[in-house]
Amino acid sequence: FAMGAVFYNQAVDNYLDEKMAPGSKTNDKPYKDGAYYTYKEHAWDEAFGYWGAVGHGLGLNAKQNYNITKMKDMAAADQNKDGVVDLKSEYNFAHAYYASSFDKGGKTNYYNTVTQAFLDGRKIIAGAKGEKLSSSEKAALQGHIATINANWEKVIAESVFKYAGSVYKDIVKLEENYSDKAFATYAKHWGELKGFAMALQ
């Protein structure tokens, strides 16, 4: 639930919404005195951080991105080959991890779609070189925002579907043969289901 109430909400309903809306802080001023990045760059980067994708994730396949979070493929995570995994830049978090978990089945491409839209949008903002965004740039940026929002929402919806199925199977098992272990599994899946469902509200 926290991922939805904080990460998802802050990204799509704040940084990619109010902060990118016409009339909000412009792109021709620094975020704050002494900052070398603009307000728009700051807001966009905040949203990307909430998505949780590793910096080099587009160069990896879905299984590798999934295994990074599961700590099963540290070689793929260690982009700079220094022998350690930097949690700030070489690790998948939050909904980006869940996206890769669905994508590895080969039927979706949420991780790459959202991450690429973030990168393409960032290029538009950076390409303005500290000047106000033009009408065409704003329109293009809104297109990337729409892509991000739609696919991020689908990741959460897929999670609801996944855990609803798990809860159903757990209930069947509990009815057939109750045990504390089976109930603990049910409770875990129920908590996941409730959290993801509430995130969509």
Positions of predicted regions on the chain:
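Mature extracytoplasmic or organellar-lumen-exposed domains after removal of signal/transit peptides
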Residues: 1-201
